[in-house]
Design a protein with these regions (language model features):
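Active-site nucleotide/adenylate-binding loops and adjacent lid/helix of ATP-dependent enzymes
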Residues: 29-33, 74-167
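ATP-binding N-terminal substructure of ATP-dependent carboxylate-amine bond-forming enzymes
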Residues: 1-70, 74-76, 80, 99-110, ...
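A glycine- and small-aliphatic-rich helix-loop capping segment at beta-alpha/alpha-beta transitions
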Residues: 55-64, 140-141, 145, 274-277
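ATP-dependent carboxylate activation and anion-phosphoryl transfer catalytic cores
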Residues: 89, 214-297
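Hydrophobic beta-strand scaffold residues
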Residues: 63-64, 92, 122, 279
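Phosphate-binding site of ATP-dependent enzymes
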Residues: 136-223, 249-252
Length: 297
């Protein structure tokens, strides 16, 4: 798969996952049926971790690793996820959201609402996007307008959040009815914040395990991670991200990633490795969570 050469491989065969539960697998262009015991989605962003693929697998009654279609969709939409978290009393940064239609129609009203509620700087994010794509930090109104346009290039809805001066930490969670939290790690971004470029292209960004916060605060993050995981209906796995504010130590939910990276150097497996669960065992457990649900959701 290096350099995407697999896309042009002569061995590639067109195929699709049949929604017919009696097929329970993949159908090739030649009509060959390949039965599937379990699917491990390794997809990020739209049409990968937003419930679309998960819904197809549920329709086909094929077990798969990770959250179901509903939870995947809720967690993917940052505005919906924030609203659910608010309803469950989970602390998070102050936020608001606007659709592209409303922002274009009532721009000044939307700007006034955001500035009065959040102050500057303001983080602007597409409501539905993966890998930190389209995130901008705005320091004034002209930058805010530009940031909204950047977000609307990725999605028709944008989420705006107050800036939190603090630690950006992550907690890996595993399980279905009785989820467990692993160790807590911290991102020390080389750039001003952990955007797409800092995440994938800047080797100076650091992942610290455990996070540079005291044990009591790490335990609080773990407890809040499990609470958020359950509140948003997660199963199988998720990485739950938080801010720990410097001024008062408050733990604030940032977002839930329902398909965290699974390479040996990704934060999710490294957090479980730090908690005593080696990579191969982690994969076995994730598949076990999927098989224990069967094809029923």
């Amino acid at each position: 798969m290096p350099e995407d050469k697999w896309l042009n491989s002569k061995s590639l065969v067109p195929a699709y996952i049949s929604p017919d539960s009696s097929v329970h697998g993949i159908v090739t262009a030649k009509g060959e049926i390949i039965k599937l015991d379990c699917v491990f989605p390794v997809l990020h962003g739209k049409n990968g971790e937003d419930g679309t693929v998960q819904g197809l697998l549920q329709l086909a009654q094929i077990p798969y690793v990770g959250c179901d279609a509903t939870s995947s969709g809720v967690c993917m939409d940052k505005a919906v996820a924030n609203a659910v978290a608010d309803a469950f009393g989970i602390n998070q940064a102050k936020w608001c959201a606007f659709t592209q239609y409303d922002f274009n129609k009532n721009r000044q009203e939307c700007i006034d609402t955001a500035v009065n509620k959040l102050g500057f700087p303001i983080f602007v994010k597409p409501a539905n996007a993966g890998s930190s794509v389209g995130i901008t930090k705005a320091h004034d109104i002209p930058e805010l307008i530009e940031a909204m346009n950047v977000a609307f290039n990725e999605d028709k809805k944008a989420v705006l959040e107050e800036f939190i001066d603090g630690h950006e930490v992550e907690c890996a969670v595993l399980g279905n009815e009785e989820p467990i939290a692993a160790e807590v790690g911290e991102i020390k971004a080389a750039a001003e914040f952990y955007d797409f470029d800092a995440k994938y292209n800047n080797p100076a960004s650091e992942l610290c395990i455990p996070a540079d916060i005291d044990l009591e605060k790490r335990n609080e993050v773990k407890a809040q991670a499990v609470k958020a995981y359950k509140a948003l209906g997660c199963e199988g796995m998720s990485r739950v991200d938080f801010f720990v504010r410097n001024s008062d130590g408050s733990v604030l939910l940032n977002e839930i990633n329902t398909i965290p990276g699974q390479t040996p150097i990704s934060m999710y497996p490294k957090l479980f490795e730090a908690a005593g669960v080696p990579y191969k065992e982690l994969i076995d457990r994730l598949i076990g969570c999927a098989l224990s649900r069967g094809g029923k959701f």
